[in-house]
From Swiss-Prot:
<keyword id="KW-0681">Retinal protein</keyword>
<keyword id="KW-0812">Transmembrane</keyword>
<keyword id="KW-0600">Photoreceptor protein</keyword>
<keyword id="KW-0297">G-protein coupled receptor</keyword>
<feature type="transmembrane region" description="Helical; Name=1">
    <location>
        <begin position="27"/>
        <end position="49"/>
    </location>
</feature>
<dbReference type="InterPro" id="IPR027430">
    <property type="entry name" value="Retinal_BS"/>
</dbReference>
<feature type="transmembrane region" description="Helical; Name=7">
    <location>
        <begin position="273"/>
        <end position="297"/>
    </location>
</feature>
<feature type="transmembrane region" description="Helical; Name=5">
    <location>
        <begin position="189"/>
        <end position="212"/>
    </location>
</feature>
<feature type="topological domain" description="Cytoplasmic">
    <location>
        <begin position="50"/>
        <end position="61"/>
    </location>
</feature>
<feature type="glycosylation site" description="N-linked (GlcNAc...) asparagine">
    <location>
        <position position="182"/>
    </location>
</feature>
<dbReference type="GO" id="GO:0004930">
    <property type="term" value="F:G protein-coupled receptor activity"/>
</dbReference>
<dbReference type="InterPro" id="IPR050125">
    <property type="entry name" value="GPCR_opsins"/>
</dbReference>
<feature type="glycosylation site" description="N-linked (GlcNAc...) asparagine">
    <location>
        <position position="9"/>
    </location>
</feature>
<dbReference type="GO" id="GO:0007601">
    <property type="term" value="P:visual perception"/>
</dbReference>
<feature type="transmembrane region" description="Helical; Name=3">
    <location>
        <begin position="102"/>
        <end position="121"/>
    </location>
</feature>
<feature type="topological domain" description="Cytoplasmic">
    <location>
        <begin position="298"/>
        <end position="337"/>
    </location>
</feature>
<feature type="topological domain" description="Cytoplasmic">
    <location>
        <begin position="122"/>
        <end position="140"/>
    </location>
</feature>
Length: 337
């Protein structure tokens, strides 16, 4: 019980207002510091690659650039505030800091799921509906990306203005949705978030990648030129990277979703403290593994990273074919003013 938590001088004692000991808080703080530094550096490298090599600045990769910004946002704000509170033994930034911290984490998380949905739609239109995909303009992509940011902002602001609320969790070192107060406001907010930012995006992603996988299988069973084979291989690389990112994102946010659903339909007091800290740690983890996915699953991005480290001014990118499926994204239909 939080009211029974006491503050002793020994390093293994419980911190005031927390269910964790000083030692446990210190271990978590060390993890957050290392993860935060790793995340910031790796995502800065990602942005540097896109800045240096214009060959990679396609509308699809514009979504990846925005994902990198969301990762940097969590890493530069969420990690330091949480780590400082863990070192302190309890939340140290007051009520206003709690609202800012929790709001920004929800904001960047919701934006990320929106951007991953945009990636899935892009893969579907590029591979399975090329006639439609070719007609998409830069403004179309910008509108979808902006929609993801606006959606994230809406759900982040709602607890601040009264629909549900933000509060420190039982560990006392992080702020999140106040799931210990499972009133009607919390339940309605949580269920709407799950429907709008989990069930609907997953349905869209499943539909898109189901049809993309069918298109890729049909290609594999057909005869084609070496030139077209290279184009399809590039598209398959991007699709593989996208699917891995989505699966890892779901893995990262699943503990948080479980905690919220448990609080909605069960007794919040029975949620284990370990689950309370694992949920936000898992949710933040996507910030540093996304760059690893880019490198591991996308050959062109991997070559670009190596080229940047070797200080090569240009990236050798083969000319794509002019067949409908793989029209280069740089030749999208002109933006209509």
């Amino acid at each position: 019980m939080l009211s029974e938590a006491s503050d002793f001088n020994s390093s293994g004692s419980r911190s005031e207002g927390s269910v964790f000991s000083r030692t446990e808080h210190s271990v978590i703080a060390a993890y957050l510091i290392v993860a935060g530094i790793t995340s910031i550096l790796s995502n800065v490298v990602v942005l540097g690659i896109f800045i240096k090599y214009k060959e990679l600045r396609t509308p699809t990769n514009a979504v990846i650039i925005n994902l990198a910004f969301t990762d940097i946002g969590v890493s530069s704000i969420g990690y330091p505030m949480s780590a400082a509170s863990d070192l302190h033994g309890s939340w140290k930034f007051g009520h206003a800091g709690c609202q800012i911290y929790a709001g920004l984490n929800i904001f960047f998380g919701m934006v990320s799921i929106g951007l991953l949905t945009v990636v899935a739609m892009d893969r579907y239109l590029t591979i399975s509906c090329p006639d439609v995909g070719r007609r998409m303009t830069t403004n179309t992509y910008l509108s979808m990306i902006l929609g993801a940011w606006i959606n994230g902002l809406f759900w982040a602001l709602m607890p601040i203005i009264g629909w549900a609320s933000y509060a420190p969790d039982p560990t006392g070192a992080t702020c999140t949705i106040n799931w210990r107060n499972n009133d009607t406001s919390f339940v309605s907010y949580t269920m709407m978030v799950i429907v709008v930012n989990f069930i609907v995006p997953l349905t869209v992603m499943f539909y898109c990648y189901y049809h993309v996988s069918r298109s890729l299988r049909l290609y594999a069973a057909s005869d084609c030129t070496a030139h077209l084979h290279r184009d399809w291989a590039d598209q398959a690389d991007v699709t593989k990277m996208s699917v891995i990112m989505i699966l890892m994102f779901l893995l990262a946010w699943s503990p948080y979703s479980i905690v919220c659903l448990w609080a909605c339909f069960g007794n919040p007091k029975k949620i284990p403290p370990s689950m309370a800290i694992i949920a936000p740690l898992f949710a933040k983890s996507s910030t540093f593994y996304n760059p690893c996915i880019y490198v591991a699953a996308h050959k062109k991005f991997r070559k670009a990273m190596l080229a940047m480290f070797k200080c090569q001014p240009h990236l050798a990118v083969p000319e794509p074919s002019t067949l409908p499926m793989d029209m280069p994204q740089s030749s999208l239909a002109p933006v209509r003013i």
